[in-house]
Each structure stands twice: as C-alpha cells, then as structure tokens.
Curated annotation (Swiss-Prot):
The RxLR-dEER motif acts to carry the protein into the host cell cytoplasm through binding to cell surface phosphatidylinositol-3-phosphate. It comes from the Eukaryota. The keyword Secreted applies. Disulfide bonds: none annotated. Effector that might be involved in host plant infection. This is RxLR effector protein PITG_00582. Keywords: Coiled coil, Host cell membrane, Host membrane, Membrane, Secreted, Signal, Virulence. The lineage of its organism: Eukaryota, Sar, Stramenopiles, Oomycota, Peronosporales. It comes from Phytophthora infestans (strain T30-4). It is found in: Secreted; Host cell membrane. Residues 1-19 form the signal peptide. One of its GO terms (cellular component) is host cell plasma membrane. Residues 81-149 form a coiled coil. Induction: Expression is induced during host plant infection.
Amino acid sequence: MLPYKTLLLALGFFFTVQCHFFASASSFDIADNNQNGVRLLRSPEKTDEERGAVDALKSELSFMKLNWAARSKITPKEKLVAKQAKEMSNTKEKLSKIEAKLQAKAVKAEQKVKDQAIKAEQNLKAKNEKAAQQLKALQQNELEKLAKQAAKDDKMYNRWLMAEMTPDDVYKKFKFKELAKKGIYPTTSVNYKHYKNYRTIYYARYPKLLEKLDA
C-alpha cells in the first residue's frame, strides 16, 4: 500500500492533468458545421508553466516510487539488523548519559568530602586555638593566684618574725605533736609547708642560731 504522501501527490498529478485537459478542450475549433461529425482541431501546445508543474509532479512520483521499491526490497534479516543497530545506538546513548551523570555525582561527592575535611580541619584548629587560649588564661590566673598567695604568706612570715617567733613556736602553734600522737604525720598537713618556709626564712635571717642548732 502506497504511503499517504504518495497518494496525495498522485491525486495532485491527476488533478493537474484533468484541468489541463479541460482547458485544452475549450480551445478546440469546430472545422465544419455542415458535416455529419464534429472534427476537433489540434489543441494548442502546453505552456512552460504547465509543463514545469507536470514535470515536477512526475519527478516527485518517480523518486517516491524508487524509495518505496527500495524499502520493499529490504529483507527481514536486514530490517532486524537495522532495528538492532538502532536499539544498540539508543542503548549506548542512554549509557553515555548515565555515565556522565554518575561521573558528575562522583565529582560532586568527592568535592563534598574535601569540603567537609577542610571544614573539620578548620574547626579542629579553631578548637585547639581556643583550648590553648583557655589554658593560657588558666595558667595566668593560677600564676596570679600563686603570686598573691606568696605575697600573703610573706606578710604572714614577716609578722611572725616581728613577733620573734621561732620555728619551734610555729611547730607548736600548728599542733603537729598532737597530730603525731594520733598517728597523723605532720608532713601530711597543709600547714607543714608554712612551717618549712618559715624555718628557712628564720635561719636565713639568723644563721648563727642555725649553727648553734647544728652544733
């Protein structure tokens, strides 16, 4: 069965020929009215425009017939091969698109991991810097506390010196003997450091007393 386009062209060709026939018939001359029959005179020649239209339709029809004949001569095997080739081409195209999408996703995921690693490193660095600052502040506060405590202890030791208290007097004031009787060593007391510090200061101020003590 001819394609729809072929039918349309054939109808157009038929319509053109028919119109040309009617136009030619109207120009026929009647040669002799007295004779029994009517003799038609030779029709005038076709114009260039008419010949061009007819030739164009004939050419188009010839091409369509040839194409149709070529298609009709294709074997089932050739059709199957062509179909498989088309399906293979479509499959390759789909696979290429999928591969491109996967590569794009992989690149995006890799960049995301890199960004997260950089961000984590920056956060860790910031935390370390903050911790170092806090430690430095704590150490500074501790040093300030120690300095204040040392100044306070010095004033206390000076008062003991002004009161002419000996290290033995300080030892008695802290009641280390009573602690020893209870089984508590004086060295475990928080006040023992004051005794030791004052003893050092006292004998540094009165070295002769230390010589007598050693003697």
